[in-house]
Amino acid sequence: MTMTAGRLEAIWIKRAHRGPMDPVQEAQLDPARGLIGSVDRSRRRQVTLLEAERWAGLMRELHAEVDPRARRANLLVSGVSLYQTRGGVLQIGSVQLVIGGETTPCERMDEALPGLRARMGNAWAGGAFAQIRASGAVRVGDPIIWV
């Protein structure tokens, strides 16, 4: 993992199961409560991340243009690779996240675009899930580094 700075490109909160991913400019993350306002409250998967570059690559491969919010991740990041980073600590603004593993794409990916689920099953293309180590606010545009 390098110290190259990335950027937080988007934040989405899911307020209801199977509900839309609502874009926000800022969100609060808390180790005890997860992503504040999000219906997902798993202790293991408190927040999910997707690489903007990987998503764009998938869209090129599939000759499609699907909004990355279709992935249903909470944070869209650029400039940092999530590939095989389990156990790594990512800092976004003042918030620290511990990468727990690769997210597994569900059938909803094929609802968004036929064939997307299979393509996302390779090399962490579906993103990563994390636990919140240090709480605080994250904002679109925040710098991202590995610590």
Each model region followed by its residue ranges:
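Metal-cofactor-dependent catalytic cores
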Residues: 1-147
